[in-house]
């Protein structure tokens, strides 16, 4: 019985530290130092939340730039079902899926002159990716320009404006946040 008291005291102490003090402290510091990020990096227009800068959305229609395909369950870009397709590179189903995506993109983008960018036909590991390369966005310019009656130059400038450079110059590549880019497109129509 004498060994039970130190064990129980240690358990209660660690429970308070790891279950109470540490979570409250990290939450408070996160809210203090990084309030926008700690609250989900929400993109707001007035009082309305339009999305998150961290999670892609399923933009459909010719007037929007399309992001990477989502492999989440039930619906595209479902944040409660994050995950990839789990199809191996050697799986014939993956080949069929990619071929179908390429055919659909070719049909939707008949004026695109180069091959379909790889990130437009392959899902990310999370299935929630919100970024594509500026080249993948530029590949879609003819379709979006035609649907919105905008010039290629206007869309090229918009892509450049919303392109983000990697934190370290030689690690990573520039990306475009599709949610922010498409919301900016909608603002052009206002």
Curated annotation (Swiss-Prot):
Alphabetical UniProt keywords: ATP-binding, Cell inner membrane, Cell membrane, Ion transport, Membrane, Nucleotide-binding, Potassium, Potassium transport, Transmembrane, Transmembrane helix, Transport
One of the record's GO cellular component terms: plasma membrane
Top-rank taxon, per record: Bacteria
TM stretches of this protein: 10-30
Cross-referenced InterPro entries: KdpC (IPR003820)
Subcellular location: Cell inner membrane
Any GO MF annotation of the entry: P-type potassium transmembrane transporter activity
Membrane-topology annotation of the record: Single-pass membrane protein
Function: Part of the high-affinity ATP-driven potassium transport (or Kdp) system, which catalyzes the hydrolysis of ATP coupled with the electrogenic transport of potassium into the cytoplasm. This subunit acts as a catalytic chaperone that increases the ATP-binding affinity of the ATP-hydrolyzing subunit KdpB by the formation of a transient KdpB/KdpC/ATP ternary complex.
HAMAP family: KdpC
Family recorded in the similarity comment: Belongs to the KdpC family.
Oligomeric and partner information: The system is composed of three essential subunits: KdpA, KdpB and KdpC.
Protein name, UniProt field: Potassium-transporting ATPase KdpC subunit
Provenance organism: Escherichia coli O9:H4 (strain HS)
């Amino acid at each position: 019985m004498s060994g039970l008291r130190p064990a129980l005291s240690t358990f209660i102490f660690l429970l308070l530290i790891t279950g109470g003090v540490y979570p409250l402290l990290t939450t408070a510091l996160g809210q203090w130092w990084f309030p926008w990020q700690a609250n989900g990096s929400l993109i707001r227009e007035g009082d309305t939340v339009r999305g998150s800068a961290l999670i892609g959305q399923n933009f459909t229609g010719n007037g929007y730039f399309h992001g990477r395909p989502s492999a989440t369950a039930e619906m595209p870009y479902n944040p409660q079902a994050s995950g990839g397709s789990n199809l191996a590179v050697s799986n014939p189903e993956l080949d069929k899926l990619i071929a179908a995506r390429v055919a659909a993109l070719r049909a939707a983008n008949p004026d695109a002159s180069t091959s379909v960018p790889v990130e437009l036909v392959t899902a990310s590991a999370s299935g929630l990716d919100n970024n594509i390369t500026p080249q993948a966005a530029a590949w879609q310019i003819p379709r979006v320009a035609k649907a919105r009656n905008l010039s290629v130059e206007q869309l090229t400038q918009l892509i450049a404006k919303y392109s983000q450079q990697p934190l370290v110059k030689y690690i990573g590549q520039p990306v475009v946040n599709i949610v922010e880019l498409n919301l900016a497109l909608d603002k052009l129509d206002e």
